[in-house]
A protein has these predicted regions:
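Core catalytic alpha/beta fold that binds nucleotide/phospho-ligands
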Residues: 1-154
Length: 154
């Protein structure tokens, strides 16, 4: 099973203020907040960690049939960081997952899987959103949309 989460960075910059009082404490662990504080682009780091958590949640919620999203209970760590790609590990309720995030100037998307080797086989297709075709007919394993983008993972 795989998960994907996409963030339209332009929309996120306009519609959300993750630095408002109390938000970081509700969503991110102390270690994650340190990553945010020390990042050269704190806003991007917030959405990176959020995207990792969401991608894993999509797997976890389907595997465990649990529909409660408590992002503070999903812990992220980064194992490899560059300007365009990030690899990480995520622990959700004592279940471990691997993530890989692709970052562009206008969006980012995170892929999640139980095994690191699974990530290399995931195919991602990006489309404008809202989409004019029936993407459900293509049978994606995971779907994410935000702002101007739709991401399908196969």
């Amino acid at each position: 099973m795989i998960g994907i989460d996409l963030v339209d960075l332009n929309v996120a910059a306009v519609e959300s203020n993750p630095f408002r009082k109390g938000y970081l404490d509700k969503v991110f662990s102390a270690e994650e907040q340190t990553l945010i504080t020390n990042a050269s682009k704190p806003h991007t780091m917030v959405w990176l960690l959020w995207s990792m958590k969401e991608a894993v949640y999509k797997i976890f919620s389907n595997e465990m049939n649990i529909r409660v999203f408590a992002p503070i209970d999903i812990q992220c760590s980064i194992t490899d960081l560059s300007t365009e790609s990030v690899k990480g590990n995520v622990c959700a309720y004592n279940e471990y997952y691997c993530t890989q995030t692709t970052i562009s100037s206008s969006y980012m998307y995170s892929l999640a899987a139980k095994e690191k080797t699974e990530l290399q086989y995931i195919k991602v297709k990006l489309y404008p959103y809202p989409s004019t075709f029936d993407y459900h007919a293509t049978a994606p394993q995971s779907i994410s949309h935000h702002g101007d983008y739709l991401a399908l993972a196969y």
